Amino acid sequence: MEFDTIAAISTPPGEGAIAIIRLSGPEAIQIADRIFYAKNSLSEAESHTIHYGHIKEDGEVIEEVMVTVMRAPRTFTREDVVEINAHGGIVSVNRVLQLLLRNGANLAEPGEFTKRAFLNGRIDLSQAEAVMDLIRAKTDRAMGVAIRQMDGNLSRLIRNLRQEILDALAQVEVNIDYPEYDDVEEMTQRMLLEKTELVRASVEQLLQTASQGKILREGLATAIIGRPNVGKSSLLNQLIQEEKAIVTDIAGTTRDIIEEYVNVRGVPLRLIDTAGIRETEDIVEKIGVERSRKALADADFILLVLNQNEELTVEDEALFEAAAGHNYVVVLNKTDLETKLDINRVRELAGENPIVSTSLVNDEGLEALEEAIKALFFAGDIDAGDATYVSNVRHIALLHQALEALNGVTTGIQLGMPVDIVQIDMTRAWDLLGEITGDSVQDELLDQLFNQFCLGK
């Protein structure tokens, strides 16, 4: 398969030390050579070499560059690739790109370099998606999961499962097409059930990693809730180590939602500092309270903050009711002041959920809170060598559908259906697993997936 030659700026826009303009395609080296001036021609350069020179337009030097030449097939796209390393200015970099486009290159679409790597067989679809997961990783663990997926851990596992299914299907077909051959082993219902159960168990095992994998990939929407002036904004500022939220002694200072990402002991949290939840006649504050209630309802995880220096109120107890059904940690703040809170009542309301005491003004209790968060979601380190985690929503959905098809095989066999009938569900499971790696996938889906990538990737 041969494509045209594409070009794009691969580094983020704006000022910086270095900017990279990338080309890929059959004419990549020749097009770069038309605007690059140095002692030796790029067209004669050996693969994986770097060359110093200048970019010129109509004889005028517009940039001093280092150019990397990489010849097919030992490149990311398996095509000829050229990377022009220029100074990180906006004007000069765009001018170099425009020169390349005028000399025969086409502007790359978002994700087109990675798409070509997939279409040319360099990587499969799950590995391609892992590239974006790596770019978006917010913790070391998330990065590790993405790297292992890029390395093909998930791909190998899925291909092994598909091969198990294919072996069973092939034996069923032989039995159907050549029933008269005595030397062909008969695929009995019992044998097919055993093979199906092996594959089904592996799919279920993968799905058991989905909740942790999804946390690593997307982060937990974490609502910080409580009555006004209990220390919610102080908690946000402490966790992110930045004065993001305004903190005063005046109740109702926070009127709107404040969001910030933070990595807490490997758990990526999307912190949402909410307006204090209480009854109010202030129109603006009332809007903030309604948004807080919605954030609470939509949250994956809740930090429920109480003031230890005040008695428990009806509004506090209502927050426990609202948090029911969520994972949450109770934060008893202001332990530097006299305790007026009924701790036994708090324990009764919290049930099995952790309770942590803090004095945020004195920087006390934050480590205990972070440990409680980690223990709640990761019972031990998940960064376990070659462990394979499913974190992609598309992959999870396909695994659920494949499991449903395999359950159909099991049910059909138990009901005494002929082997050639239950193979329909078996074939469906094989196809669904193939969609994860891209072995069976529609062009429309490919376009949709790769359009989510950044330009130049």
Curated annotation (Swiss-Prot):
Ligand binding (K(+)): 229, 248, 250, 253
Residues the record lists as binding (6S)-5-formyl-5,6,7,8-tetrahydrofolate: 22, 83, 122, 457
InterPro entries found in the cross-reference section: G_TrmE, GTP-bd, GTP-bd_TrmE_N, GTPase_MnmE, MnmE_dom2, MnmE_helical, P-loop_NTPase, Small_GTP-bd
UniProt: Mg(2+) binding residues: 233, 254
Cofactor note: Binds 1 potassium ion per subunit.
Uppermost EC category: hydrolase
Keywords on record: Cytoplasm, GTP-binding, Hydrolase, Magnesium, Metal-binding, Nucleotide-binding, Potassium, tRNA processing
Gene3D superfamilies in UniProt: P-loop containing nucleotide triphosphate hydrolases, Probable tRNA modification gtpase trme, domain 1, tRNA modification GTPase MnmE domain 2
Documented EC number(s): 3.6.-.-
MF annotations from Gene Ontology: GTP binding; GTPase activity; metal ion binding
Subcellular location: Cytoplasm
List of residues binding GTP: 229-234, 248-254, 273-276
Subunit structure: Homodimer. Heterotetramer of two MnmE and two MnmG subunits.
HAMAP family linked to this entry: GTPase_MnmE
Recorded family membership: Belongs to the TRAFAC class TrmE-Era-EngA-EngB-Septin-like GTPase superfamily. TrmE GTPase family.
Name the UniProt record assigns to this protein: tRNA modification GTPase MnmE
Origin species: Listeria innocua serovar 6a (strain ATCC BAA-680 / CLIP 11262)
